[in-house]
Structure formats: structure tokens, C-alpha cells
């Protein structure tokens, strides 16, 4: 089924930025991990190692735990609401509790076995070179890419298993925040829209939905107090700064918070 709309997302705090980056990389990993071509294995490897770079921070478990705990606290307040399915809510709360327990009980850094793998470390050290890891910088990797497809797929799946708990946690956090509110129909005048934000109940994630056929995209600038959006036309051959659309733009906007 061909998509007719595109959803742009703007994170407004560090946990959301981490989760969106990881979701993006985990999707790339999932798309290519089972494909037999060496080029697909290369793309899967790049996604795996970039994800490892994203999580290479000492405060990751703390930030994820704080986010899960905050979401749990907010969801608990819904238990006595007549509009809430308490059975479904309790299942979600139990899931979040398991994730928090897992993070507390994990004594090592997430992804530590991958950091200790000398083969992956060699590739990772060349990840951001202009050409990335290539034949003359990482000959072992060049040889690995020529191994039978079943060997490469098996290796990638074994390495990706290290991320499985993290994938589940990231998916849960993002699903809860995305479903916390419903999008509103908005009209931007002369390609510009601004809105004051509630600082006492801060927005955590901005979602903006546009029809693909319009061939326009947003520049989103959001802080604690104000949201500003400019709409620009897609022009891949323009050598000058793209000018803001000078017409009314209808779109959907969702300020997600929990």
C-alpha cells in the first residue's frame, strides 16, 4: 500500500531524541539483516554499529529508567477512569515494570559484548571515514562480506540479539508517547505557523502530518514555551536558500505529552 502522507517528528527532550535515533537505526537493521546480498549485509552492519554508537553513553540506563517510571506514574492515574480498559492498562503497566526491573538488574552497559568484539571494533573505528570501512582499511570485513549469505545473516542475527531488550523498551516508550494525544487539524497562513506551549505540562514530541503530493516539508523550531513551523517546497536542484511557501497549508499537528 502506497503511503499518501508523511509524518515528521521533532523530539523536545533527550530521551525522545535517543529513542527516535535508535528506532530509525533498528528499522534499517531489520530491513536488511535477512537479505542475502553483501550490500544488504553492509547496510545492516552500518545500522548495528551506529546504534552501538548512540547507546555508548554512561547515562543511557538512567534516562530510559526515568522515562519508563514517569510514564508508569502517569498511566497509574488513569486506573479509576471509566473510559479506560483496566485489563489492557494493567498489562501495559506490568510490561513497563518488567522493563524497569530489567534495566535495574543489568549490571553491565547495554551492548557491552559488541564493544568487546575486536572484529566489530575494527569496523567501528572506520565508520565515519569519508569512504567508511573499505577493502584497504578493514580487510577482515571485506572478507566477511564475501562469506556465504547464511553465515553473514547468522552473525548479524547473533549480534542483533544484544539489542532485543532495548528494542522492546524503545518501542514501548515511543508507542505510549505517540498515542498520548490525538492530532489536530491546523492551517498555516503564508506557510508559517506558531503556537505557545504549556511549560507546566511540557510537550515531549511534536508530530506533523502532511500529504506527500504537496511536495512541501516543515522546518520545526520548538522550545519550552513556543513552537514555530515554516513550510518549504522540495527543490533538489536549487543552489540558493529555499524560500518559505507563501500560501495556506493544511496539516495535522500532534503535541505528544504524558
Swiss-Prot record:
Source taxon at top rank: Bacteria
Subcellular location per the Swiss-Prot or TrEMBL entry: Cytoplasm
Subunit structure, as described in the record: Interacts with FtsZ.
Family: Belongs to the ZapD family.
Function: Cell division factor that enhances FtsZ-ring assembly. Directly interacts with FtsZ and promotes bundling of FtsZ protofilaments, with a reduction in FtsZ GTPase activity.
One GO cellular component term: cell division site
Protein keywords: Cell cycle, Cell division, Cytoplasm, Septation
Name of this protein: Cell division protein ZapD
Gene Ontology annotations of biological process type: division septum assembly; FtsZ-dependent cytokinesis
Lineage: Bacteria, Pseudomonadati, Pseudomonadota, Gammaproteobacteria, Legionellales
Bridged cysteine pairs (disulfide): none
Amino acid at each position: 500500500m502506497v503511503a499518501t502522507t508523511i509524518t515528521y517528528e521533532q523530539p523536545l527532550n533527550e530521551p525522545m531524541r535517543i529513542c527516535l535515533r535508535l528506532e530509525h537505526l533498528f528499522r534499517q537493521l531489520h530491513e536488511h539483516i535477512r537479505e542475502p546480498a553483501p550490500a544488504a549485509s553492509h547496510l545492516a552492519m552500518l545500522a548495528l554499529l551506529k546504534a552501538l554508537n548512540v547507546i555508548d553513553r554512561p547515562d543511557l540506563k538512567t534516562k530510559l529508567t526515568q522515562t519508563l517510571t514517569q510514564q508508569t506514574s502517569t498511566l497509574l492515574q488513569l486506573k479509576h477512569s471509566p473510559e479506560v480498559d483496566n485489563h489492557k492498562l494493567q498489562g501495559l503497566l506490568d510490561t513497563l515494570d518488567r522493563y524497569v526491573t530489567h534495566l535495574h538488574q543489568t549490571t553491565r552497559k547495554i551492548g557491552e559484548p559488541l564493544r568487546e568484539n575486536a572484529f566489530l571494533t575494527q569496523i567501528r573505528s572506520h565508520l565515519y571515514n569519508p569512504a567508511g570501512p573499505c577493502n584497504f582499511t578493514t580487510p577482515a570485513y571485506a572478507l566477511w562480506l564475501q562469506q556465504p549469505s547464511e553465515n553473514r545473516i547468522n552473525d548479524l542475527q547473533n549480534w542483533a540479539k544484544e539489542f532485543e531488550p532495548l528494542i522492546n523498551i524503545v518501542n514501548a516508550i515511543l508507542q505510549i508517547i505517540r498515542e498520548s494525544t490525538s492530532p489536530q487539524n491546523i492551517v498555516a497562513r503564508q506557510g508559517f505557523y506558531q503556537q505557545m506551549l504549556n511549560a507546566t505540562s511540557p510537550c515531549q514530541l511534536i508530530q506533523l502530518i502532511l500529504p506527500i503530493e504537496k511536495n512541501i516539508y516543515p522546518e520545526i523550531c520548538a522550545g519550552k514555551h513556543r513552537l514555530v513551523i515554516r513550510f518549504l517546497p522540495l527543490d533538489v536542484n536549487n543552489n540558493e536558500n529555499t524560500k518559505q511557501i507563501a500560501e495556506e497549508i493544511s496539516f495535522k499537528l500532534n503535541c505528544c505529552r504524558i
